[in-house]
Amino acid sequence: MAVQQKIRIKLKSYDHSLVDKWAVKIIDVVKQTDAIIFGPIPLPTKTHVYTVNRSPHVDKKSREQFSFSSHKRLIEIIPTGRTIDMLMKLELPSGVDVEIKS
């Protein structure tokens, strides 16, 4: 029995609605090819916090904190012949980072 190949697509963005929207679009495209889909699986959100001094010269105790969160989703696909062709035609926005592993 042959081992089936899996495609893992990881979506990353600072905007959670953008990640969710494009995860749904990818799933809709893949469903047209009759491939098996697992996901979107939400991965842990990482929050980055940066602390800076408010004043450039004095008042070391006066600081301000900035934070942003990076949201991730994972989609696993067991592809058919047309799945990869359909995924290559898909154009994603610049706000979403896509990582594809097989």
From Swiss-Prot:
Key word S-adenosyl-L-methionine present: no
GO annotation terms (biological process): translation
UniProt-listed InterPro entries: Ribosomal_uS10 (IPR001848), Ribosomal_uS10_CS (IPR018268), Ribosomal_uS10_dom (IPR027486), Ribosomal_uS10_dom_sf (IPR036838)
NCBIfam families recorded: PRK00596.1, rpsJ_bact
GO molecular function, one term: structural constituent of ribosome
Main function: Involved in the binding of tRNA to the ribosomes.
Descriptive protein name: Small ribosomal subunit protein uS10
Keywords from the UniProt entry: Ribonucleoprotein, Ribosomal protein
Subunit structure: Part of the 30S ribosomal subunit.
One cellular component term from this protein's GO annotations in UniProt: ribonucleoprotein complex
Keyword Ribosomal protein tagged: yes
Family assignment from sequence similarity: Belongs to the universal ribosomal protein uS10 family.
